[in-house]
C-alpha cells in the first residue's frame, strides 16, 4: 500500500479565496501574514473537485491517505480549525486520526506528497512531491490521472 500525504491549504482548502474575503485581511498586523488571521481556517471553501478526488483516494485499496499540513505557530486556534475543517467536509469514518500537523514534512516517510508549496520541507520530501497547481499538476484531475485513479 502506498502512503499519500495531502496538504490542506491551497490543495483541498481554498486559502487564497479565504484570506481575500476575511474581514480583517487588510489590517496591518495581518498584511503579509494571512495565516495569523483569527478564524482563517474555519470557513475556507473547498478547491474545485478536491473533496471528490480525496474521497476517491481514501476509498482506493492501493493508497493509505493522510492529511499533512502546517499550522502557524503563532495562531494556535488554527490547529483545531484545520481538524474541524476536514471533519466538516469528509465522512469522519474515512478520515478519523488521519490528520498530521507538522512543520518539517521532509521527516515523514511516504510515497507521495501532494502540496502546492515547496516550504516546510515539501520540496525535500523523500518520496515524490506532486506539486499541486504547477504546470504538470494544475488541478485534481491531473493528480488522479497520474496516480491512475478513476
Please name every model-derived segment.
Residues 41-46, 90-93:
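Short, flexible loop segments at the rims of nucleotide/cofactor-binding pockets, characterized by
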Residues 75-150:
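C-terminal cap/substrate-recognition subdomain and adjoining C-terminal extension
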Residues 45, 50-80, 86:
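Substrate-recognition element of Asp-dependent hydrolases with the DxDx(T/V) motif
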Residues 1-3, 63-64, 109-111, 127:
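Short coil/turn segments at beta-strand junctions that form active-site/ligand-binding loops
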Residues 1-44:
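Active-site neighborhood of HAD-like aspartate-dependent phosphohydrolases
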Amino acid at each position: 500500500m502506498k502512503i499519500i500525504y495531502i496538504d490542506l491549504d491551497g490543495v483541498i482548502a481554498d486559502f487564497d479565496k479565504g484570506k481575500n474575503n476575511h474581514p480583517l485581511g487588510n489590517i496591518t498586523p495581518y498584511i503579509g501574514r494571512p495565516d495569523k488571521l483569527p478564524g482563517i481556517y474555519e470557513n475556507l471553501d473547498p478547491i474545485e473537485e478536491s473533496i471528490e478526488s480525496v474521497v476517491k483516494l481514501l476509498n482506493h485499496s492501493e493508497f493509505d491517505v493522510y492529511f499533512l499540513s502546517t499550522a502557524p505557530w503563532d495562531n494556535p486556534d488554527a490547529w483545531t480549525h484545520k481538524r474541524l475543517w476536514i471533519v466538516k467536509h469528509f465522512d469522519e469514518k474515512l478520515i478519523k486520526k488521519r490528520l498530521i500537523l507538522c512543520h518539517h514534512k521532509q521527516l515523514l516517510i511516504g510515497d507521495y506528497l501532494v502540496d502546492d508549496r515547496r516550504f516546510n520541507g515539501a520540496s525535500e520530501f523523500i518520496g515524490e512531491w506532486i506539486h499541486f497547481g504547477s504546470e504538470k499538476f494544475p488541478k485534481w484531475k491531473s493528480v488522479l490521472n497520474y496516480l491512475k485513479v478513476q
